[in-house]
Amino acid sequence: MEYTVSYLLVLFLIGAIGSILSGMVGIGGSVIKYPMLLYIPPLLGFVAFTAQEVAAISAVQVFFSTLAALVVFKKGGYVSFRLVGYMGTAIVIGSFIGGYGSKFLADETINFVYAILASIAAILMFFPKPKGSEEVSAEQLAFNRLYAVVLSFIVGVASGIVGAAGAFIIVPIMLVILKVPTRIAIGSSVAITFISSIGATVGKIMGGHMLLVPSIVMVIASLLAAPIGAKLSQKINTKVLEYILLVLIVATVIKIWYEMLT
């Protein structure tokens, strides 16, 4: 595949825009960048990527964008490592089980499981958050460990079944059910997504679907843009962050149901 300067610029902008948004609201970015990579290049007259190539590029990009954003959130004190330990471990174990078990399920069942879970995440975002929860620090954070482990395990299984990240589902669970402050939920979600992206990145590289040049461009964009999104996240009003997250989740849910029903 031949890469012109304009093509590489388009890829860089896709990576930068997606990384800023994902850094702001604590999702890995594949939810945003996957459709952008799949549809924008051919719309502009460039050669289209295959779904496998897009998934591979997204996996590598998510790894580096979450790593870059995590550094910023950690400095700001918005990462609860206890929360990350419980939920990160459960979601990784769940994703392995879901990934293996998916071969026993029909495609329709796989899509339905994820559509239902994503819809629940969207509904959760409409629930009011408890007052005063934003004042708790990451060190003082108390949460129901059983709920954290069980719910993140379920998300991990569903994510593994579908082969997609579950960060956009984890954040609403943290906000509404575990009552985690918005900025800590976002920072901790970035850490969890980073952990869960390691396996996906290694798998895609070993699978031979990696395109070196686009991946490098997207990684550079991520390393530059994700910290910007993370810094913006610490300055923007938490309500605005929740609205941005809500829009992204609802758009994802609509896309999932549309693809399943058409």
Over which residues does each language-model region extend?
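Juxtamembrane transmembrane-helix boundary motif
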Residues: 1-23, 32-45, 52, 68-158, ...
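Hydrophobic, membrane-facing alpha-helical anchors
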Residues: 6, 10-14, 59-69, 165-171, ...
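Short hydrophobic/aromatic, small-residue-rich stretches within specific transmembrane helices
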Residues: 58-62, 189-193, 214-219
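Aromatic-anchored, glycine/proline-accented short structural segments
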Residues: 169-191
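Interfacial helix-start motif at the membrane-water boundary
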Residues: 51-58
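Transmembrane helix boundary and interhelical junction motifs in multipass membrane proteins
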Residues: 25-34, 163-173
